[in-house]
Amino acid sequence: QLGYQAESGAWRNAYLVAAFELRNGTGLYPKAAQLGVGTTAQGMDAQTMLDYMGIIMDTEKLQDRSFTINLKLTDADDYLLKLHHGVLLYYKDALSDEADLTISTPRIGILAITSGNQENIDKLITVEKGDKALFQAFCDSMAAFDLYFNIIEP
């Protein structure tokens, strides 16, 4: 009843989500939304996708490694990615001849890496130069978020 009586949208949403969680749990949400590749994500530009990649990267998996990646996007600008001790930096239109890895992909291939979808990674991304094991380590460093966590229950 509190959810229907609250005037504030934020309070109303909190009460109604809590009631839904108590009745149904948190496992009833669509699986596609958990992957982070919905229409909103597909509409992001390359820089926003790379920012997202930097956010979800598990820095502890690559904390002892430093390498560079030439990212050639077939439908957007090219980027130089530098990974130094688990921190991802990117530079627009700054490819390097000395990069450890060169990959080519459409912009949506960035989302394939962030979602960990190996089928789409194989389909969309081409390793032009460099060690494929390094590319796999880069892909494996992406953390999988649990988007649907409990709001009111511990």
Which residue ranges define each predicted feature?
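Feature captures hydrophobic
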Residues: 1-154
